[in-house]
Amino acid sequence: LNTHVLKNRGFVSLWAGSAISELGGSFGTFCNSIIVYELTGSKLALGSMWLLYFLPSIVFQLVSGPFIDKWSRKWIMIFSQWTRALIFLVPLLSMFLGHLEVWHIYVVQVIIGLVTPLYVPASQAITPTIVAKEQLSTANAYLDGTTRLMMFLAPMAGGVVINYIGTDFTLLLVFILLALSGFLLLRMDEQRVPQGIRKTWLEQFNEGIHYFFKERTIVWLGIFLAFVQFGVGVTMVINLPYITDVLKGNYEDYGLFMAGFPLGYVIGSLLIGKIKFRSRRMFMLGSLVIGGLTYISLGIINAIILAIIVEIIAGIMMAFFSIHNITICQRAIPNHMMGKVMSVRLVISRTAMPIGIVFGGIISELWGIRPLYIMIGLAISLVSIIGIVFPYFKFIDGPPQPELLPKKNNYARQ
């Protein structure tokens, strides 16, 4: 890698700020999940917590996108970080005063859901303005690689930290990390780009919708992804009680379990360039079939170590599907339409997550956790098998391509 980018003070500030933000955000998510489950013992309440994050996040992502370029991206990011830091003082102070209630966590989730959609697109947009064009790929590699490393380390570290110092001091650590992230971002020297006449938000969004539904490969891959996202929504509700109640583990075990998927994704992303295949459809949808089987496995096994191994396998399989999926989209969509179409794709796929959260919260209370893992695993595997078996879906193979290398990775289980 070109090390000259590390001599750029603005980039180093962005790099460090993003890494600390990822760590603080992951710790905060851990704390919120544990507090809600300890206060209520209800998987439905845990699901409500995630809904209160995702619903505002999805809605605000729609309306905020066209306006990001009009504002200072640097100050959007700083505002996002400091707002997140301050809102975590609500449960922290309530805990110290002995008056912590579930609604305090719900307020935190709503606010975080509103400000998080601001940070990510602003971060992606500001990077080309603070590094030279020839250093952009190196800068993105540093940013993306560090973020994925934090996603791997944070669950393990979060489990250990909460287990040893408690949720109250961990919330204080979250506040410090997010506030520090904002201060680091102050060191960036933003170069504002003059804006020409822009279309209205509605006009831009309509363009994205029309193009998205015109490309059937993108549409159907989005539908397959939506089934996976539905499963992710379900697991957001049941992963914590699965480890602590079903497998009788502690918060350290939960952290290791949650780290398994991003670790697998990193492994999968390293392997993907070395794997040759004849049919893109068979490779991608076959990966989803195996991914569905990992859910079924979680519904059967009794050992935490096996559950962690299964999550690593799931991460590898999801990398195979997701990286090819995003690369197909990047190659099919014209550059001037990329943001609009990608936002439509993201909103449609992410909408499946709240549905999964509601489903998981209700069904887990009625039927239990193990049957739910088996159910979502069967759904993902069966839908993927249909895509493999039915000749209609041959268009997913597309034109012959010697290689399909990723431009961007998404390391979440989605």
Region spans (language model):
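Transmembrane alpha-helix termini and helix-breaking/packing motifs in multi-pass membrane transporters
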Residues: 33-39, 91-97, 153-173, 245-246, ...
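Juxtamembrane intracellular "pre-TM" segments in multi-pass secondary transporters
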Residues: 1-11, 190-223, 407-414
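Helix-loop junctions on the cytosolic side of multi-pass membrane transporters
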Residues: 125, 129, 171, 175-199, ...
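MFS-fold secondary transporters
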Residues: 28, 37, 90-95, 112, ...
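Helix-loop boundary and gating motifs at the non-cytosolic
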Residues: 2-56, 210-259
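Substrate-agnostic recognition of the 12-TM MFS/MFS-like secondary transporter fold
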Residues: 12-29, 53-68, 72-87, 104-162, ...
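C-terminal transmembrane bundle of multi-pass solute transporters/carriers
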Residues: 59, 76, 80, 90, ...
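Helix-breaking motifs and short loop linkers at transmembrane-helix boundaries and internal kinks
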Residues: 40, 72, 94-95, 99, ...
